[in-house]
Amino acid sequence: MKNYYLALIVSALLTINIFAEEVEEVVVTSSLTKQTVSDLKDPLHVVDGDDVKAGGIQSLGETLDELLGVHTADFGAAVGQPVIRGMSGSRVRVLENGVVVRDVAALGPDHVNDINLLNSQQIEVVKGPSSLLYANGGAGGVINVVDNSIATTNITERVMSLGVETQSVNNGEAVDFSYENNISGFNV
């Protein structure tokens, strides 16, 4: 009987040590822009802002139409909604600088996203369930349009841009003016 109690005490002490050595898994998420694409496991695609401006594209869906697994649901001039892996509408979240855009585009497929593509620095697309780390309800994917409205680095050269867009179908017009400069250490 003494051997039984001794074995029970020794096994209890050994199991305490086993439980003390277990460590929980820690998941760390960060901003989409601080890592290179090759470092990420998530299916992240980045479209450079210069490519967007050079293409003269009018809608967010049309901009991303060339990416694998992404196409546009075209509802007329400048109303191309992004479709990621067959999901659109409320299943695809649109963010601007990491903040969910709440506009009338979520109400119906024929409403345009209120995103200024002419001022975009880059467009980040996360597809699939990993997009739930960045916005709720976006099981299809998340599109983050990053602009330089809050500069993260010092501006080294003066840049001035003007964009004008017209649409003949609905007599729509859009004008964008952007000016960037560093004056005495202050980004303007």
Residue ranges and their predicted role:
Residues V100-K127:
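Short acidic/polar hinge/loop motifs at secondary-structure boundaries
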Residues F75-A77, N113, S168-G172:
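Transmembrane beta-barrel outer-membrane domains
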Residues G61-D103, Q121:
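Extracytoplasmic beta-strand/coil segments of soluble accessory domains associated
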Residues N119-Q121, L132-V188:
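Outer-membrane beta-barrel translocator/receptor signature
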Residues V23-E25, D39-D42, L67, V79, ...:
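Extracytoplasmic
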Residues E25-K53:
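N-terminal periplasmic "start-of-domain" segments of outer-membrane beta-barrel proteins
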Residues M1-E21:
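Cleavable N-terminal targeting peptides that direct proteins into the secretory/outer-membrane pathway or into
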Residues T63, R85, V126, V146, ...:
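Transmembrane beta-barrel domains of outer membrane proteins
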